[in-house]
Amino acid sequence: MKVEAITKEETKKPERKIKLAIAKPEDYSNKNVILEKEEELICPVCGSKNIIKDYERAEIVCEMCGCVLQQNLFDVGPEWRAFDHEQRVKRSRVGAPMTYTIHDKGLSTVIDWRNKDSYGKDISADKRAQLYRLRKWQRRIRVSDASERNLAFALSELDRIASKLGLPRNVRENAAVLYRGAVEKGLIRGRSIEGVAAAALYAACRRCKVPRTLDEIAEVSRVDRKEIGRTYRFISRELNIRLAPTNPVDYVPRFASELKLPGEVESKAISILQKAGEKGLTSGRGPTGVAAAAIYIASVLQGTRRTQREVADVAGVTEVTIRNRYKELTEHLDIDVTL
């Protein structure tokens, strides 16, 4: 590989020099190479922003033309190797990463519940009583005032609801950020902590395109559906949260999975919904009902039929709703369904 030294004259940061080398773009088509996108750099040769970091070759490379922007990068990872989770936990010398789902963002000190010293040896009996008192006071000072206690309770409630709904980590983090924003603006006053937490989680679900209905959240949150909806509209307005209407397509994978339908049915249902959206058949209608009708039609067309009752129970709608949406979709999309 030929290496040339080129000075970048026209750049936003003057007096900055970048060593360039030309690599073949096809060298980075191998899926076994660990790559990471670099958003801040711009290729000085072709002007592309598709810059990747190749940890295997220790280089920063333009994905379009193969220009090597930097080489011989330092490895900032740990010096030890771990081959399973247990080894990783034992050899790690740092705590968990910062998270918004804990009231102190996970930055406070925690005294381990195991009565062992740093060498793994058991602590003597006369030291255990002292360690117990230290552990108790450490838990107390982590939550120093009423606002922190309320935040700790709200985030634990938020985590409980998310766990019951099976929501991923990014949704929980998003909901925690929204709740903290509501606390900073004083939107909690006069409202229940559980209601605001449930509303923040509902907004996070829609923002992350992992939709859950108000009924599903109300069922596990011990808060009335109307209160969640009212609180959601309030915090959305005050926090300037702009969310597009929920797309029925987002419900299809979950409904199809719960009905144990094959991938062909899911793909067919998504295709039906996309055509319906182009003709405006999904606007002004409940997304769950439209998604349920599309899944029902797709299951019949693919020969893996599910009854309207089964689909309605999974989607949380009535059989009448499915029949109405079914009639609209089949008529306007010219779908011939043989029952």
UniProtKB/Swiss-Prot annotation:
This is Transcription initiation factor IIB. Keywords: Metal-binding, Repeat, Transcription, Transcription regulation, Zinc, Zinc-finger. Gene3D superfamilies: 1.10.472.170, Cyclin-like. The keyword Cell division does not apply. GO terms for cellular component: transcription preinitiation complex. One of its GO terms (biological process) is transcription preinitiation complex assembly. Belongs to the TFIIB family. Stabilizes TBP binding to an archaeal box-A promoter. Also responsible for recruiting RNA polymerase II to the pre-initiation complex (DNA-TBP-TFIIB). Sequence repeats lie at residues 156-239, 250-331. HAMAP family: TF2B_arch. GO terms for molecular function: DNA-binding transcription factor activity; TBP-class protein binding; zinc ion binding. A zinc finger (TFIIB-type) spans 39-70. Zn(2+) binds at C43, C46, C62, C65.
